[in-house]
Regions:
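Terminal leader/tail segments of proteins
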Residues: 1-4
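N-terminal cofactor/phosphate-binding cores enriched in small/glycine residues
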Residues: 7-69
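Fe-S ferredoxin-like electron-transfer domains
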Residues: 49-193
Length: 193
């Protein structure tokens, strides 16, 4: 049987197993760490930074940081929650995220995270970027005004259904999600996939 590893999250002992990340061990122990890009069955990449914690005083992404014996993890602190609010706030002002007009209102992780962190109105000015829409595939439509570039669709499409439907294109401010039309040509891809 594998040796258990004991560490602390906000002063509480948490046990995990070698190879687990702090996020996985926290979930197993019932300790909530905020996240947006993390999905349980996918390799984490820490792109959203909402799960940022402090491990022995150093900022780390909980979804990618492996557990280690005796480390002290800070999660639910005023400083970290303020940074999380800033990140979520920026997601809202950089895109077309007007919850009361959205069909996903009430069933949206971004909206739920904002409420959980106490965000009632953005503190930054809206940017209203003019993001293009992608309707290059007959069964898929990407509204880039709502995309926060978390990468979940890209990773899920590669790992879970192995179709590589979506991909990142561009770099920096020009980075966006695109439908890999060449890969989909002649496939039986359907909206239900």
């Amino acid at each position: 049987m594998d040796k258990t590893i004991t560490f602390k999250i906000d002063g509480v002992d948490v046990k995990g197993f070698p190879g687990q990340t702090i996020m996985e061990a926290a979930d197993a122990a019932g300790v909530y760490i905020p996240r947006l890009c993390y999905l349980k069955d996918l390799t984490p990449h820490g792109s959203c930074r909402v799960c940022t914690i402090k491990v022995d005083g150093r900022a780390q992404a909980a979804c990618t940081q492996p557990i280690a014996e005796g480390v002290e993890v800070e999660n639910n602190t005023a400083e970290l929650n303020e940074k999380r609010r800033d990140i979520i706030d920026m997601f809202f002002v950089e895109g077309n995220h007007f919850c009361m007009f959205c069909e996903k209102s009430g069933n949206c992780e971004l909206q739920a995270m904002a409420y959980r962190l106490g965000i009632c109105a953005p503190k930054y000015p809206f940017q209203f970027p003019d993001c293009s829409l992608d309707a290059t595939h007959p069964d898929l439509f990407i509204d880039r005004n709502r995309c926060i570039l978390c990468g979940r669709c890209v990773n899920a499409s590669k790992v879970i259904d192995e179709k590589s439907v979506f991909e990142f294109v561009g770099r920096g401010a020009a980075k966006k999600i695109a439908v890999n039309a060449d890969t989909l040509a002649g496939t039986n891809m359907a909206v239900s996939d």
